[in-house]
Amino acid sequence: MEAWECLEDFSAVRNLLEQSSNSTSWFWRFLWGSSQAKLVCRIKEDYKWEFEELLKSCGELFDSLNLGHQALFQEKVIKTLDFSTPGRAAAAVAFLSFIKDKWSEETHLSGGYLLDFLAMHLWRAVVRHKNRLLLLSSVRPAIIPTEEQQQEEARRRRRQEQSPWNPRAGLDPRE
């Protein structure tokens, strides 16, 4: 996810969502937009129909968001975002950018609120994913050696004890 480390900074996430939404002109994006914003727009255009189907499965998502309820959004959208690979992270950003575009057509809320709301949830999901990875990498599973590994370790110890370079070689092991 090195290419998407910008997602760990809230202002960068907000800028990325803003640049990749339909509220930014393609000309501005072409001249001054980041390469990630251009990629997100491309993904959003390529997968428009799949994103439409996903939104249809969410039911009354925009109605609940317009009323200020976040539970459905958290359950159906945020918890299903995947950041395991750079491609999936880009698709997650594209989906939220698509949601911003659709939501802005159907709401009385300001564009700044929509942008802040989606950027905050995306940023929190990325941070949660990163913390989960750090936690998993710090936990080491107990390694139980197999019988072959135990036998190999015993042979290695015997060879080391019998080595002429070992100062204790040839001594009685009971001492």
From Swiss-Prot:
Region described as Disordered: spans on this chain: 147-175
InterPro entries xref list: Adenovir_t-Ag_E1B_19kDa, Bcl2-like
Sorted UniProt keywords: Apoptosis, Early protein, Host cell membrane, Host membrane, Host nucleus, Host-virus interaction, Inhibition of host apoptosis by viral BCL2-like protein, Membrane, Modulation of host cell apoptosis by virus
Subcellular location: Host cell membrane; Host nucleus envelope; Host nucleus lamina
Top-level division of the source organism's lineage: Viruses
GO biological process: symbiont-mediated suppression of host apoptosis
Principal location class: host cell
A single GO cellular-component term on record: host cell endoplasmic reticulum
PROSITE patterns, alphabetized: BCL2_FAMILY
Family per similarity comment: Belongs to the adenoviridae E1B 19 kDa protein family.
Record function comment: Putative adenovirus Bcl-2 homolog that inhibits apoptosis induced by TNF or FAS pathways, as well as p53-mediated apoptosis. Without E1B 19K function, virus production is compromised because of premature death of host cell. Interacts with Bax protein in cell lysates.
Full protein name: E1B protein, small T-antigen
